[in-house]
A protein has these predicted regions:
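General small-molecule cofactor/ligand-binding pocket signal
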Residues: 34-36, 82-86, 137-139
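Glycine-rich, Arg-bearing micro-motifs that act as flexible, cationic patches
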Residues: 106-132, 143-149
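Active-site phosphate/pyrophosphate- and oxyanion-stabilizing loops and adjacent acidic/basic residues
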Residues: 23, 71, 96, 126
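Small/aliphatic-rich secondary-structure junction motif
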Residues: 2-49, 131-134
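Acidic, proline/glycine-rich short linear motifs
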Residues: 37-64, 146-152
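Structural beta-alpha unit
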Residues: 75-107, 150-152
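Short, solvent-exposed amphipathic alpha-helices that sit
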Residues: 21, 58-69, 93
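Short, well-ordered secondary-structure micro-motifs
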Residues: 18, 45-48, 95-96, 119-120, ...
Length: 152
């Protein structure tokens, strides 16, 4: 069974750095990459049709980000990732995905180059850090391409 590196992607630069790291790591270890994008539900909107339109717009934006990022890693690492788009709470989406896949070797998250590392990094390295069935790899968002290549 191939090792799968799970990357949670959003529109942040550090998420794209984490994706490039995971792609290079997977290519070097004959592994695979799962790209998980999460569409978060909007706060209550009085009209259901408006809420559905807002969520669909967010979904299309995230799918565009994923498509652009996937193009980068396909050309750089020569692998085709599995793309999963889920709706809901990001923490629950990550746990749900990992819970359905026995081949996830690591959760790969990008940390912001400065300030708060991001909500998923904070969650999965905080109070519940020991509850995942796989390690968490935190990739600094400030790494250069050369550093990514060396470390992967």
């Amino acid at each position: 069974m191939a090792r799968t590196y799970l990357v949670v992607i959003d529109d942040s630069a550090e998420a794209r750095v984490a994706l490039r790291f995971a792609a290079r790591r997977a290519a070097k270890t004959d592994g695979e990459v799962d790209v998980l994008a999460v569409v978060e539900p909007q706060d209550f909107v009085q009209w259901g049709g408006v809420q559905a339109a807002i969520e669909e717009e967010q979904r299309l934006r995230i799918e565009g980000i994923v498509a652009a990022s996937v193009g980068e890693i396909m050309s750089a690492a020569g692998i085709t990732p599995e793309i999963v788009v889920r709706q809901g709470d990001p923490v629950a989406a990550v746990r749900g995905h990992i819970g359905t896949r026995e081949d996830v070797a690591a959760l790969v998250l990008g940390a912001a180059p400065s300030g708060h590392p991001g909500p998923l990094v904070a969650h999965f390295t905080g109070h519940d850090a020991g509850k995942l069935p796989c390690p968490v790899m935190i990739i600094p968002g400030s790494l250069s391409e050369d550093q990514l290549e060396t470390l992967s």
